């Protein structure tokens, strides 16, 4: 069950309208690593968690907060658009310089959403459920969460550098702080799970069923041997085994030869040599 609180978690009020920045801000709302993605990712991970209540609660707490961030950013986008009426934009566009700036406005904001946010990226790509990861393996999922928070915080930091609007910067500063917390919480949870299960996912798959002679080889597939200079090659792998550097990749299989397709699929016939 969800209960909506009408107050925002943090203020989301720009100092002035900026349709172009509203378009840019769509990325951290409906882009691949935007707030919609992390909210839905954590929700489905939480709903699918079995028998690990403390992690389920962590996921649901974080997911619910992220829904609030969706609301904050959507509000900010709407406010960046609301005081810039279309007739004023048309008049301003008569100036070539201003016109070139307004020309970058997301037309969806005017045509589709009526000066409101959209569930899409800064380039108008609709948000997709294919962005989220919810595998049922918490260690794998928490690593995906760490990546999502890392990419998301990176994008927020870049947006922070693109504006001098104090109101926008204030909200972005808050989001940066919360992403710092979320990165740290996933790092801590990953460390805890690795201590229980080992660092390789899935830790439940029998090692005897994998070709272990290849399990810790760093294979050189390119010219030169710069990759051999990794300091960690001289240390134990995170799972306790020894690394091995292979300076030249070898082939262990045969040249693949496929049978001709059946006539009913109408493939190109094999060529004659």
Curated annotation (Swiss-Prot):
Family annotation (Pfam families): Mn_catalase
Catalytic activity reported: 2 H2O2 = O2 + 2 H2O
GO molecular function: metal ion binding; peroxidase activity
Gene3D superfamilies reported in the protein's UniProt record: 1.20.1260.10, manganese catalase, domain 2, chain A (3.30.1530.10)
CDD domains per UniProt: Mn_catalase
pH dependence: Optimum pH is 8.0.
Name by which UniProt lists this protein: Manganese catalase
Region span, Disordered: 254-273
Keywords per UniProt: Calcium, Manganese, Metal-binding, Oxidoreductase, Peroxidase
Cofactor binding remark: Binds 1 Ca(2+) ion per subunit.
Positions contributing to Ca(2+) binding: 57, 61, 220, 222, 224
Stretches assigned to coiled coil: none
Temperature behavior of the protein's activity: Optimum temperature is 55 degrees Celsius. Exhibits a half-life of 2 hours at 80 degrees Celsius.
Family: Belongs to the manganese catalase family.
Xref: InterPro entries: Ferritin-like, Ferritin-like_SF, Mn_catalase, Mn_catalase_C, Mn_catalase_dom
Source organism phylogeny: Bacteria, Bacillati, Bacillota, Bacilli, Bacillales
Organism, as annotated: Bacillus subtilis
CC cofactor: Ca(2+); Mn(2+)
Self-association and partners: Homohexamer.
EC number(s) from the headed UniProt entry: 1.11.1.6
Keyword Isomerase: no
Binding site for Mn(2+) 1: 35, 66, 69
């Amino acid at each position: 069950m969800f209960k909506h609180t009408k107050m925002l978690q943090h203020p989301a009020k720009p100092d002035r309208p900026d349709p172009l920045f509203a378009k840019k801000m769509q990325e951290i709302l409906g882009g691949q690593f935007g707030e919609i993605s992390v909210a839905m990712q954590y929700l489905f991970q939480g709903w699918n968690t079995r028998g690990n209540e403390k992690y389920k609660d962590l996921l649901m707490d974080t997911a619910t907060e992220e829904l609030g961030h969706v609301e904050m950013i959507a509000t900010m986008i709407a406010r960046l658009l609301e005081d810039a009426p279309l007739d004023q934009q048309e008049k301003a566009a008569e100036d070539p310089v201003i016109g070139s700036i307004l020309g970058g406005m997301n037309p969806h904001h005017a045509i589709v959403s009526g000066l409101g946010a959209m569930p899409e990226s800064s380039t108008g790509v609709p948000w997709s459920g294919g962005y989220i990861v919810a595998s049922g393996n918490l260690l794998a999922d928490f690593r995906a969460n760490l990546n999502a928070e890392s990419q998301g915080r990176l994008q927020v930091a870049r947006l922070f550098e693109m504006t001098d609007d104090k109101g926008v910067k204030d909200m972005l500063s808050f989001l940066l702080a919360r992403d710092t917390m979320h990165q740290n919480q996933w790092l801590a949870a990953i460390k805890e799970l690795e201590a229980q299960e080992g660092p390789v996912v899935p830790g439940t798959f029998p090692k005897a069923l994998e070709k272990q002679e290849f399990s810790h080889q760093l294979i050189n597939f390119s010219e030169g041997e710069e990759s051999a200079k990794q300091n960690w090659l001289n240390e134990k792998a995170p799972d306790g085994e020894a690394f091995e550097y292979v300076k030249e990749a070898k082939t262990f299989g045969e040249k693949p030869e496929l049978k001709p397709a059946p006539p009913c699929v109408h493939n190109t016939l094999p060529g004659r040599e």
